[in-house]
């Protein structure tokens, strides 16, 4: 199998062209490849497939390091756009892709940055999915170590966002897995910990579903800003500082699509025997 190793702000991926290669991945194979000591090592594997819809350019699949398939990854989407361009699979500047849960437009800007139309945030609890009687801007979540207030939203994948006073001392290591596996999120959840610096700037750490805490989570940054805007804490354009670097997130409110802008880096190409 030929592959590329890439990262978006330190959130690292193996990207595979399944258009020119005939490949099948079992969860066990993905877990073996994800092993940082015995395999390649990655947070997620991204698969480039032919489009299911003639009006689109590609189909985009995402697998966690534990072998589970997920519906969305914002940092991965930027790497996906960089990969299909570098490999000559398209010469378009605006690339239309489908995912498990919807469609996305990946735009390569003149300065090389990649701007992703992430679509509209989804707030309806049943569609996140999240167990609640109705939408609220804040929900009370009880865990074995503390009770937290969180916002819940889907960016094509489920997120809960907790505001913290200090990102450095936030209890991500213990609280992250408790939120990820909370019974009110039947498909598990990505847990974001957000410190508001001012209305146009936040700091964020994300404990990702199936991957643990990562250097950066693009959809998590989108979710944090969406929740912050909805709660009246943030303006429509926000710089999000993650451990691996910064993203710009723009959202003008309900009924509008959300945009994420950031970089994507190609590290190396490789071949591995399956």
Curated annotation (Swiss-Prot):
Statement: the UniProt record of this protein carries the keyword Cytoplasm: yes
UniProt entry tagged with the keyword Disulfide bond: no
GO biological process: lysine biosynthetic process via diaminopimelate
Pfam families per record: DAP_epimerase (PF01678)
Subcellular location: Cytoplasm
UniProt xrefs under SUPFAM superfamilies: Diaminopimelate epimerase-like (SSF54506)
Molecular-function GO terms, alphabetical: diaminopimelate epimerase activity
The family this protein is said to belong to: Belongs to the diaminopimelate epimerase family.
Biological role: Catalyzes the stereoinversion of LL-2,6-diaminopimelate (L,L-DAP) to meso-diaminopimelate (meso-DAP), a precursor of L-lysine and an essential component of the bacterial peptidoglycan.
Protein name: Diaminopimelate epimerase
Organism encoding this protein: Pasteurella multocida (strain Pm70)
